[in-house]
Amino acid sequence: MKATDNTTTGPGWNFDNSYARLPDYLYTRLDPTPVRAPQMAIFNSSLSDALGLATNTLAGDEGVAIFSGNRIPEGAQPICQAYAGHQFGYFTMLGDGRAHLLGEHITPTGQRFDIQLKGSGRTPFSRSGDGRAVLGPMLREYIISEAMHALGISTTRSLAVVTTGEPVYRETPLPGAILTRVAASHIRVGTFEYLAAQGNRDGIRTLAEYTIHRHFPELLQADNPFLALLQTVLEKQVELVVRWLHVGFIHGVMNTDNMALCGESIDYGPCAFMDSYDPDTVFSSIDQDGRYAFARQPAMAQWNVTRFAETLLPVLHDEGEKAVELANRSLATFPDIFQRLRMDGMRAKLGLFTKEDADMSLMQDLLTCMQQNQADYTNTLRDLALETLPDTPFFREPSFTAWHQRWQTRLTRQEEPVEASRALMRAHNPAFIPRNHRVEEALAAAQERHDFTVLEKLLEVLSRPYDDQPEHAEYRQPPPPSEKPYQTFCGT
């Protein structure tokens, strides 16, 4: 969607707030609550440059004032978005309880991005919450979202974190902070569920049309644009979850309000990256039943897309039975698309340029071997690309040795040279992920000692995840056994 006003202000903002022109039942107009003594904790200069902003200006007092909510930039129209969601399977009405969407910034190349403050004060959707956020979780989202971007995975980005100079009261007083999130949009499955719960058929049509115009204008040419929207959202979610699996990422809270229709990873609460391979891995303290465990993420994505399909039924077809038939036909494509993308990705991770029927068992047997021996997921796959395998207990295991011989034989049936396979593997198997103990180390230094050098060093390493970086080899190491099991928390 193109900007209607290309006026650029001093800091480089170029706001055109199309969502705020939608019916007001989708949001509430409200400014952020000012804070006492904001300071810049971290500022993403490279992202600022990419957005066409005046980086030098925003890195100083001007940025602190804007990113804290103390100053509304010219052209912004702050709103709090309404949405609902299925949280761990249970439906509830929600909304931005501690966030304000400043508006949509248009880059010099015509790209449109939401600029949202998170932790910016109470809203009509806050319920019993205080509308504030704690420094640790905001820095955590900054680290993980930027790492995901470097890994090549579609994600929201983090432009800045400011401290507020005010305590936030959880179990104990903690330093308050506000994150500035950059997203293609914040249209969620839960946004459609909010309208469906109210029986607002016209609202569903309006929001669906807006989503198509904003994100998928090519669908306007489809025979049934709303059905095409469902199929496109489904395919984007499959692709996203497959990419998560390939790097060992566990979102932790795949509620429908945390599924963005644009296909970006969003809301990095109790997320984490898997160390030793186990498909049942759960990190979130609130996921007691393992609903969002590593291997269950594809099924949960399909469940979420099904909830989206239900909201679209009134606009898919005038006849109810026909609408259900169309939706089910689209939803039925999920398993095959997932299997194809999953296998394509795993072939690349194993250096395979060609397809054979036995590739599925080759992949699964490796994962089973890794699980049985508690092998590190990231390091094992990365090290397979080496000419000589490291002398580790796992690589000496008879079960792995037998698998390795099968894999070597499979490689010989390709025309591509071995070095081409190794290059393919290095491009698809990161050497560096945000190791949980390294993330906690950086957060502790920032929160307890106000030392951001540990975090900055971690971000530097994570910005080049596919490079060997032998000088940073310690960042590849899994946590010592004494630090397991690792547990994450929501941070709300």
Curated annotation (Swiss-Prot):
<keyword id="KW-0479">Metal-binding</keyword>
<feature type="binding site">
    <location>
        <position position="130"/>
    </location>
    <ligand>
        <name>ATP</name>
    </ligand>
</feature>
<keyword id="KW-0808">Transferase</keyword>
<keyword id="KW-0464">Manganese</keyword>
<feature type="active site" description="Proton acceptor">
    <location>
        <position position="257"/>
    </location>
</feature>
<feature type="binding site">
    <location>
        <position position="258"/>
    </location>
    <ligand>
        <name>Mg(2+)</name>
    </ligand>
</feature>
<dbReference type="GO" id="GO:0005524">
    <property type="term" value="F:ATP binding"/>
</dbReference>
<feature type="binding site">
    <location>
        <position position="188"/>
    </location>
    <ligand>
        <name>ATP</name>
    </ligand>
</feature>
<dbReference type="GO" id="GO:0070733">
    <property type="term" value="F:AMPylase activity"/>
</dbReference>
<comment type="function">
    <text>Nucleotidyltransferase involved in the post-translational modification of proteins. It can catalyze the addition of adenosine monophosphate (AMP) or uridine monophosphate (UMP) to a protein, resulting in modifications known as AMPylation and UMPylation.</text>
</comment>
<feature type="compositionally biased region" description="Basic and acidic residues">
    <location>
        <begin position="466"/>
        <end position="475"/>
    </location>
</feature>
<dbReference type="Pfam" id="PF02696">
    <property type="entry name" value="SelO"/>
</dbReference>
<dbReference type="GO" id="GO:0000287">
    <property type="term" value="F:magnesium ion binding"/>
</dbReference>
<feature type="binding site">
    <location>
        <position position="267"/>
    </location>
    <ligand>
        <name>ATP</name>
    </ligand>
</feature>
<comment type="similarity">
    <text>Belongs to the SELO family.</text>
</comment>
<feature type="binding site">
    <location>
        <position position="131"/>
    </location>
    <ligand>
        <name>ATP</name>
    </ligand>
</feature>
<keyword id="KW-0460">Magnesium</keyword>
<feature type="binding site">
    <location>
        <position position="181"/>
    </location>
    <ligand>
        <name>ATP</name>
    </ligand>
</feature>
<keyword id="KW-0067">ATP-binding</keyword>
<feature type="binding site">
    <location>
        <position position="118"/>
    </location>
    <ligand>
        <name>ATP</name>
    </ligand>
</feature>
<keyword id="KW-0547">Nucleotide-binding</keyword>
<protein>
    <recommendedName>
        <fullName>Protein nucleotidyltransferase YdiU</fullName>
        <ecNumber>2.7.7.-</ecNumber>
        <ecNumber>2.7.7.108</ecNumber>
    </recommendedName>
</protein>
<dbReference type="InterPro" id="IPR003846">
    <property type="entry name" value="SelO"/>
</dbReference>
<feature type="binding site">
    <location>
        <position position="95"/>
    </location>
    <ligand>
        <name>ATP</name>
    </ligand>
</feature>
<feature type="binding site">
    <location>
        <position position="98"/>
    </location>
    <ligand>
        <name>ATP</name>
    </ligand>
</feature>
<keyword id="KW-0548">Nucleotidyltransferase</keyword>
<feature type="region of interest" description="Disordered">
    <location>
        <begin position="466"/>
        <end position="492"/>
    </location>
</feature>
<feature type="binding site">
    <location>
        <position position="97"/>
    </location>
    <ligand>
        <name>ATP</name>
    </ligand>
</feature>
<feature type="binding site">
    <location>
        <position position="267"/>
    </location>
    <ligand>
        <name>Mg(2+)</name>
    </ligand>
</feature>
